[in-house]
């Protein structure tokens, strides 16, 4: 039977519960255990698919087409285990399912209440699909004391009693702020956070304390005494240079050993940290550096591009170099010369996005890369803008545009209305709801045998994750090909363009999918490894 680890947070948000969960999962894997990680999100949205990136950050898409929290990206990157739709749930989705049951009469006339109906739905979610797994790590979003989170805290409290003894523990992540004027770390915020947690019936077994310095022995003793935990269970979570050093740091602090002790697992299997050591050797000893410009529209919040940032770092690891990112708001190119911002960079990446704002700036970035022979990587919207630029500048389609921006005489990019999901035909229309109506999840693509992208993958059949509502119009395929822009990848039925590449260019590739979602520190995605290698070559020319 699986053992359950519940990770909660206190004092302030954004302390890194997702990263802590992922790191602990990786440490348990290093000891030979199997893990599954899940995230409970207290907000009322069904999923983050329609939320602003500035509100929520990145939407992480799973193979089975779920739009989920960005923490699931951490889970995948650290453990290598693909996340699924059933690894993330929100209050909105729970309420939606409960109300649907009530309308069907499933509750047989009972009064539907938070306890037991909502809490039971949460418990059912946590316990489902865990056969054959040694540990299930469950992260609860938000901080203790949030009104939205109360049903989730009540549910995990009940689970602590429902499960057999020594099958559930609670880890509480808190902040130990350093007060310069006093010259010391303060434990009172953590004490109050634990007091709040205990008031709803949860006694943490382990405290994971975020800090930028060593926790003195006296402060550990104080936290153990007033928070009712063992002194050895007060774990120091120091800031580190790279997120990929977190597993090693937490192991050195004794987190995984304390978790196994809390479950009564002794003697504990010794961990194999060799692959984490190998990753960090590459991070700490780069043999060069390249600068990549990310030309986007959500550059004010880096979490909007979390998987992209990590995939570029993985590409750097593959080439043993450091990747420096220049963040550029695409709108500036609509009034300023792109050369001022791009002359010094070694590669240009235009990521996914939605809407007309900043689109012309992305088109200008693609033009700069094409004309100056700078490596260009267009992802999703970035591929579409590159095709529009090529249609206008190379194929003579002066009015080329996307129907996403309004009616156009030359719809080089248009709304997808039909596509196949396995054996099922998916149909969408302009008036469809925004939520859950995109082409989502993993789809296969066929690559042209002698194309650059097929050489990069070392294969002609691939599967990648998608999240888009618009597509490049195949009616323009021949005109573009005549001018050196080829559709190197198509859906298996040949109807949907998946990749484009420019023939007369050292590295100019656009993809309709999101390869960043499948990159891992131990297995850098081949497209990012190749893109960074091309940028390295460019750095020797500049």
Swiss-Prot record:
Catalyzed chemical reaction(s): UTP + L-glutamine + ATP + H2O = CTP + L-glutamate + ADP + phosphate + 2 H(+); L-glutamine + H2O = L-glutamate + NH4(+); UTP + NH4(+) + ATP = CTP + ADP + phosphate + 2 H(+)
Coiled coil segments of this chain: none
Binding site for CTP: 13, 146-148, 186-191, 222
Activity regulation: Allosterically activated by GTP, when glutamine is the substrate; GTP has no effect on the reaction when ammonia is the substrate. The allosteric effector GTP functions by stabilizing the protein conformation that binds the tetrahedral intermediate(s) formed during glutamine hydrolysis. Inhibited by the product CTP, via allosteric rather than competitive inhibition.
Pfam families associated with the record: CTP_synth_N, GATase
Residues that, per the record, bind Mg(2+): 71, 139
Entry keyword annotation includes Ligase: yes
Region listing for Amidoligase domain, in residue ranges: 1-265
Positions annotated as active site in the UniProt record: 380, 514, 516
GO MF entries: ATP binding; CTP synthase activity; glutaminase activity; identical protein binding; metal ion binding
Complexes and interactors: Homotetramer.
Function: Catalyzes the ATP-dependent amination of UTP to CTP with either L-glutamine or ammonia as the source of nitrogen. Regulates intracellular CTP levels through interactions with the four ribonucleotide triphosphates.
This protein's name: CTP synthase
Source organism phylogeny: Bacteria, Pseudomonadati, Pseudomonadota, Alphaproteobacteria, Hyphomicrobiales
